[in-house]
Swiss-Prot record:
Protein name per its UniProtKB record: Anthranilate phosphoribosyltransferase
Catalytic reaction list: N-(5-phospho-beta-D-ribosyl)anthranilate + diphosphate = 5-phospho-alpha-D-ribose 1-diphosphate + anthranilate
Sites where the protein binds anthranilate 1: 79, 110
Residues the entry annotates as binding 5-phospho-alpha-D-ribose 1-diphosphate: 79, 82-83, 87, 89-92, 107-115, 119
One GO cellular component term noted in the UniProt record for this chain: cytosol
Organism for this UniProt entry: Buchnera aphidicola subsp. Schizaphis graminum (strain Sg)
EC top class, as a word: transferase
Cofactor(s) listed: Mg(2+)
Residues annotated to bind Mg(2+) 2: 223-224
GO biological process: one example: L-tryptophan biosynthetic process
Cofactor mode of binding and number, as noted: Binds 2 magnesium ions per monomer.
């Protein structure tokens, strides 16, 4: 193991087997906090490679508690976080909109580590019980098209890194692993990444993990589709990878000024999303969520982004999404 440590400290990338062995040791609690802190920092500084990410995924997958895979098509939508922007929680909001439109979503969620508000932080504000039983999660998915799998419930090995990550408060390889470790093993996924250089390597990982269809995206320094610049896409379709760029106009949306960018606290994030889902939000937030939903619907086979955006906006402005959120919350209270 010392040879692996030395390689990392010398800013050399590990091969897949070395990464697998390292993260297997982390999963078994054999790496102490000081070692882990230096490893994660060094890997982040030289940039995590495709082989390092894959090796870590395989190591943690072996110790993951699986969620029974439904016999219908479903997707995840998730951002890596780590873009330091602390914008509203777009992926969770988009998941609710898609579910309200009739699409099945199993969202892998966690607390915010490198951002102010993770998906589970927002869900707790909506009084959505993340400690519900596996059976009840499946029941809600069947009836209301969505369920949430809280990472600590399915990945006991994460506990060995949680303290170190919370102290570091920086993006690490763990930001890149979570999107590929959904316990339901979705055939479809939409993943936003915090830097453009990750788009192509992450799409190759989708292919190696045998996803049916998926999109990796990065939009102007954020892990979501952007309204004020170019969104870079790498899409896995029919076992081939296609790279392209999208502009706001491709969604039928007028470009917004970059000056509108604002950081939000967890409380502000919740109130903005609540208001938006009630159909009383600002145009910026409505459209930001809608374009991300549009891309999510694309991987379900609905290829027209402009039409998808219209569908999402109509659903958001109707207030039906908030009613759907409350249905999920109330059904989970019965557990």
């Amino acid at each position: 193991m010392q040879n692996i440590f030395n390689k990392i400290y010398e800013s050399k990338s590990l091969n897949q087997e070395e990464s697998y062995q390292l993260f297997k040791s982390i999963a078994l609690g054999k790496i102490n906090e000081i070692q882990l802190s230096s490893i994660l920092t060094a890997m982040q500084m030289h940039g995590e490679s495709e082989k390092e990410i894959l090796g870590a995924i395989y190591a943690f997958s072996e110790r993951m508690k699986f969620f029974p895979r439904p016999n219908y098509i479903f997707s995840d939508i998730v951002g890596t976080g780590g873009d330091s922007k602390n914008t509203i929680n777009v992926s969770t909001s988009s998941a609710f909109v898609a579910a309200s439109c009739g699409f099945k979503i199993i969202k892998h969620c966690n607390k915010g580590v490198s951002s102010k508000s993770g998906s589970s932080d927002l869900l707790n504000k909506f009084k959505i019980n993340l400690n519900t039983s596996l059976e009840n999660s499946k029941k809600i998915l069947d009836k209301l098209n969505i369920c949430f799998l809280f990472a600590p419930k399915y990945h006991s090995v994460f506990k060995y890194a949680s303290k170190t990550r919370s102290i570091l408060k920086i993006k690490t390889i763990f930001n890149l692993l979570g999107p590929f470790l959904n316990p339901s093993r979705p055939p479809l996924t939409l993943i936003g990444v915090y830097k453009k250089d990750l788009v192509n390597p992450m799409s190759r990982i989708l292919k190696k993990l045998k996803y049916q269809r998926g999109i990796i995206l990065h939009g102007d320094d954020t892990d979501e589709v952007t309204l004020h610049g170019t969104t870079y896409i790498s899409e896995l379709l029919n076992n081939k990878i296609y790279s392209y760029e999208l502009e706001p106009e491709d969604f039928g949306i007028k470009r917004h000024s970059k000056s509108i960018f604002v950081e939000y606290s967890p409380e502000e994030n919740y109130h903005i999303i609540k208001k938006t889902m009630q159909g009383k939000g600002e145009k910026l937030h409505e459209e930001l969520i809608a374009v991300n939903v549009a891309l999510l619907l694309k991987i379900f086979g609905h290829e027209n982004l402009k039409e998808n955006t219209k569908i999402a906006l109509k659903k958001i402005r109707s207030g039906d999404v908030y009613k759907h959120i409350m249905q999920v919350s109330n059904m989970l209270k019965e557990d």
